[in-house]
């Protein structure tokens, strides 16, 4: 192999390793068998959720996983592999890919990583069932507002009772 090719591959490994280190979550899939239309729709859905999706050679993925300290991921890089990276939303790649896989039987989830920890297919599917960040924040806000709302109702009830007595 020429020096230029080796240097280019080393640069790719470095770039992918940095993406792996920075990612909040990574989902590895086998997208073999998807139609062009399905692949385009999947990529569009992932892009709308700020998820980066790439098909990368396994040899580069294996070296990048080693460099990023994610050795457990190496077992997933067998056969055709595509990788979804999300730097912000932990749930987005799992949710988009899991939802898409329900309609596209050819899409197979292999596994992934969440915050640097290996994640099985079952864990990714469970993660996909969780609400997204905005949904979780609204649930938290509802829980935090409930006691204040109850106090307000109690004060209002006492005030109405005092008006009836007066």
UniProtKB/Swiss-Prot annotation:
An example Gene Ontology CC term for this record: large ribosomal subunit
CDD domains in UniProt: Ribosomal_L10
SUPFAM superfamilies named among the record's database cross-references: Ribosomal protein L10-like (SSF160369)
Classification via Pfam families: Ribosomal_L10
Signal sequence, start to end: none
Keywords: Ribonucleoprotein, Ribosomal protein, RNA-binding, rRNA-binding
Single annotated GO MF: large ribosomal subunit rRNA binding
PROSITE patterns named among the record's database cross-references: RIBOSOMAL_L10
GO biological process per UniProt: translation
Keyword Nucleotide-binding among record annotations: no
Coiled coil region boundaries: none
InterPro entries in the record: Ribosomal_uL10 (IPR001790), Ribosomal_uL10-like_sf (IPR043141), Ribosomal_uL10_bac (IPR022973), Ribosomal_uL10_bac_type (IPR047865), Ribosomal_uL10_CS_bac (IPR002363)
PANTHER family, A to Z: 39S RIBOSOMAL PROTEIN L10, MITOCHONDRIAL (PTHR11560)
Similarity comment text for this entry: Belongs to the universal ribosomal protein uL10 family.
Function of the molecule: Forms part of the ribosomal stalk, playing a central role in the interaction of the ribosome with GTP-bound translation factors.
Matches recorded under HAMAP family: Ribosomal_uL10
Subunit structure of this chain's protein: Part of the ribosomal stalk of the 50S ribosomal subunit. The N-terminus interacts with L11 and the large rRNA to form the base of the stalk. The C-terminus forms an elongated spine to which L12 dimers bind in a sequential fashion forming a multimeric L10(L12)X complex.
Name under which the protein is recorded: Large ribosomal subunit protein uL10
UniProt source species: Streptococcus agalactiae serotype Ia (strain ATCC 27591 / A909 / CDC SS700)
Lineage, broadest ranks: Bacteria, Bacillati, Bacillota, Bacilli, Lactobacillales
């Amino acid at each position: 192999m020429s020096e230029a090719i080796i240097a280019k591959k080393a640069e790719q490994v470095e770039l992918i390793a940095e993406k792996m280190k920075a990612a909040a979550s990574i989902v590895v899939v086998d997208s073999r068998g998807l139609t062009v239309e399905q692949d385009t729709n999947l990529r569009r859905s992932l892009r709308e959720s700020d998820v980066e999706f790439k098909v990368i050679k396994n040899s580069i993925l294996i070296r990048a996983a080693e460099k990023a300290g994610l050795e457990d991921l190496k077992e997933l890089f067998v056969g055709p592999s595509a990788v979804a990276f999300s730097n912000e939303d932990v749930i987005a790649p799992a949710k988009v890919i899991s939802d898409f896989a329900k309609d596209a039987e050819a899409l197979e989830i292999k596994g992934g990583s969440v915050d640097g920890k290996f994640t099985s297919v079952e864990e990714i599917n469970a993660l996909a069932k969780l609400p997204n960040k905005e949904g979780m924040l609204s649930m938290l806000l509802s829980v935090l507002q409930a006691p204040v709302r109850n106090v307000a109702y109690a004060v209002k009830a006492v005030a109405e009772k005092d008006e009836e007595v007066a």
